[in-house]
Amino acid sequence: MISALFSRGADGVPAPAPLDFATLQLPASPNTCLLTPSVAAGQGHLQRDPLPASPEAVMAALDRVAAGMERTYPLARFPARNQAQWVVRSALMNYPDIIVAEAAAVAGGTGLWMYSRSLIGWSDLGVNRARVMAWLEALEAALRAG
C-alpha cells in the first residue's frame, strides 16, 4: 500500500477486478458507502429509485461526471457487467479511494449500484458517503440535461 501513496492517478492501487454487488460483503470499518437501487435487496447505506434512462445512458453520463471530478482517474471498465471503476485521490495526503459503479435494467428503469471505499485507514470521516451523494447529484443533473 505504500506505493499507492507515492503514485499518481490510478497507478499503485491493487489490480482491478469486477465487483459482484450481489455477493459484496461490507467491511466492519466505517470507511465505505454503498448505494443500491431501492427495488433491489441489499445492504446499502443509501438507496435510489430506478433512473429514467437506459443502463448505457446512465454509464455514459457517469463517465462525464467522473471526468469532471477533481483528482479522479479511470481504473477499469467491464462492459459485460456495465461496470466502471475509478481512483479518487485525496488532495492533502494523496490517499487513493476506489469508486465502482454499475447500471442494470430493473423494474421501473435502471438500477444504480455505487460503492466508494477507502484503501487506507479505518475511518473516512464521511468522505465516501459525501462522494457517493455528490456523484449521484451530478449524475441526476447530467441525465436531466441529456
Sequence positions of predicted segments:
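Ser/Thr-rich, low-complexity intrinsically disordered terminal regions
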Residues: I2-G146
